[in-house]
Amino acid sequence: MTYLSQIKIPAIYMRGGTSKGVFFNLSDLPDSAQVPGTARDNLMLRVIGSPDPYGKQTDGMGSATSSTSKTVILSKSSLADHDVAHLFGQVSIVKAYVDWSGNCGNLTAAVGSFAISSGLVDATHIPENGTATIRIWQANIKKTIVVQVPITNG
């Protein structure tokens, strides 16, 4: 029996609102998955455990519901006045398909925390105590989203 080789990719499983998803820093993905296309889609499908003809996603991080079959890819934004760029993928449970056309407001609520903890936000924008305002470019829908993240003791 032959097995595909495994690679290590840093990621965080996060909850935002009623949804859960796997968050990635774009620069941590393999080169082939840093650009849109089949390699990126196949990686997201594999991580979530899709397609699963039984609808269970037992071989991945998905939990067999549309609210838990999600991925987020973040990077520093190249746009002025934005801290991070956010790409959202809704992963089908039973089909080999990732929908990159929409956004998940629930997981967007977790983007600021991930961006700060991953070092994607300039440290000068993060108070020791108070509220950090994070400007997100949501690449799927081409909109600016502003989130506020409470900070205690840095």
Enumerate the language-model features and the residues they cover.
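A glycine-rich beta-to-alpha transition motif near the start of alpha/beta enzyme domains, typified by
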Residues: 1-154
